[in-house]
């Protein structure tokens, strides 16, 4: 008997199901009209370069002062219950401008959204998207575990400028549809999402338009006893439209995955679920096909790579202990490539906004904790066509997040988050190994431990105002055996600590510190053609350390309105080159207002 195709089965289910509205605005709360909101920010700083390096450096400016004023005015209109549009106009002025000199005006955001027939949601223009960690996803940035409150204002600037929502979403321009269907039998509900976006425009010559499209179909089963299943199919495709320019070749990247979350035990003391995701990727470079010329239907693309991945495990929740535990086995193939999931937040090839080059030789300063904490210039939300460079001192086990290719092993996690308790904590442990050796048959082993804790000290010490402690650490080791030339042994430790104390009504004292040490050696490959290893430029050897610490005051005028004045100092030291040790001191004031 010929099996029933899944598409036909889905179509039959959709036809049999009554449509249900998703997120339609409540009738009682609707008021047509125009609203205004936005953000205002004033930022002024002075930075000074010092340390041993400056004893001989006669070319680098020791002190830099700059700043800016930014006003983002959002104008939104809702003429009826089912339609809403919004535009954000940015006015920016660099401090030092005179009578309008240095002022720029630009449109930062435009979108429209609404509901069709009280059932289908749509959005056009700027939009934020996330599916799963292997399809469309924005991994967390390097050099951060649990940011101290002292560094939060600068982190908020980075997140705002790069459209980071905090939910691992990527910013795109395009269109999106969402709708849900309810069922009386077989399934409880089905949710459908489809999207199409342009992620790169054409220059009408050698750079073609690059598009991204895909979607998700998710289904939820009725609950039968303790058992209930949620499953979904995710698909994302990135392709170059070669008809939009004169380019002779372009890329294609297709990723499809299935995910499932099956609850097998529900109780007051214990709830257990089985979780899994698996799929495949296709990455290829194809030539333009001339419609007037004869083409070979069996012709192979210029480059084609395919691979698979899967992760499967168990998640257990202990409600009485406010504890959630999970353990998964992970296998991500060496040639697995998913551009919309593996593109990093930090682009190490970008220029730093402060002291990009230092020393008499004008060497480019390596990205450090100082830049990772505060510099929007090195961050991006763009989707790249290949694996981006990374720094093994900050993230070597999972530089591209959970979708990092060529990894097999275990990922364990625990979250302790009780209601009303002064302590919350989480920990992640990853024990991984390469699937395929790079430049040798020997395989690297990766061990990663990441832990964070938030402690409300006020109830513990009897303090009448806010008093909070934040802690974070990341310990990472990479090792490989074999001959001396093959051997790898790199260890990095990152520590974070911060203290926030309200000393007067809405006046906070902020203290924070971050420190990293790294020692050992590794081989960092040069990547070409999606994720192919082209070469190893030589061993990456390091024995260095850096620290960033500071203190400041913050006055909260109201919710999302504050002024902070801070003093910070950053130091970098390498045992192999002590004459190049340097430090950067920074004093800044930041006023931020959301309205």
Task: Describe the predicted segments one by one.
Residues 558-580, 595:
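C-terminal beta-signal and adjacent terminal beta-strands/loops
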Residues 71-75:
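Histidine-anchored nucleotide/phosphate-binding helix
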Residues 106-153, 159-164, 168-171:
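Hydrophobic or amphipathic alpha-helical targeting/insertion segments
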Residues 1-5:
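Positively charged n-region of N-terminal signal peptides that target proteins for export
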Residues 589-592:
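Blade-level signature of beta-propeller repeat domains, shared across WD40, Kelch, NHL, RCC1
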Residues 30-32, 43-68:
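Surface-exposed strand-loop-strand hairpins of Gram-negative outer-membrane beta-barrel proteins
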Residues 23-33, 62-66, 80-102, 119, ...:
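Signature for the C-terminal beta-barrel architecture of outer-membrane proteins
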Residues 7-17:
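Bacterial N-terminal signal peptides
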